[in-house]
Amino acid sequence: MSTQATGRARVRQESCTAKLAKFFPEASPVRIPVRLTRVMGEGNVCTESTVIEFGTPREVLFSSTLPLEFADRLRLENSDGTLDAEASVVALQYTSGRTAVAARFTHEVSNWIVKP
């Protein structure tokens, strides 16, 4: 006599950032904690801590709760100061209340971990 097991298989859900990374074939997984600042006019700034989840030689991909829009200017800084770069939002993907963001560096970052 056979019995049938029932239960849910554990399925790891793909992050919203991983879904966006599919549009960037050069994207490599990384895990870099950063301070993200949205650079706005007239001294207004919005900041948050986030983690860069994917990188290419020119772009970074991360999740954000800030109200970001296409072409917004961002500043990315890590805690030890080895990363301090400006980037511009080039893609946004909204998924279940979270926003995946791709931003392109505005200048070459000489010590960026992802090389061509």
Language model region names:
Residues 1-116:
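Structured alpha-helical
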